[in-house]
């Protein structure tokens, strides 16, 4: 996957204030507030910054966490997982492998077959509906 690099000014011009705060500054949207939290429509969720395909609606489930949750990405190569020691805890941060956007976190408490819960901010995603 070809990496996307832009200046801070280019990201600010492309993204809304909330998208910029979450994707480029590592923020988090309020739980239960995102456009895709309750979404059941079929399609592929892409990175809002670079349009990389990240998650399929077929892997989406209701975790009750307040954020869209997925049990697997479209491809492990489309994500980067980094250790996050912020807020006094250790978590695994999920970033877009193409543009380095902060997407959310992954936890080892998801459903089978992976046992993972990718907890992703809605503002980081753009659903390309199928059908």
From Swiss-Prot:
Write down the superkingdom of origin.
Answer: Bacteria
Active site residues per record: 119
Provide the E.C. number(s) assigned to this enzyme: 1.8.4.12
* Matching InterPro entries: Met_Sox_Rdtase_MsrB, Met_Sox_Rdtase_MsrB_dom, Mss4-like_sf
What is catalyzed by this enzyme? Answer: L-methionyl-[protein] + [thioredoxin]-disulfide + H2O = L-methionyl-(R)-S-oxide-[protein] + [thioredoxin]-dithiol
Write out the GO cellular component annotations.
Answer: cytoplasm
Q: What name is this protein filed under?
A: Peptide methionine sulfoxide reductase MsrB
The scientific name of the source species is Alkalilimnicola ehrlichii (strain ATCC BAA-1101 / DSM 17681 / MLHE-1)
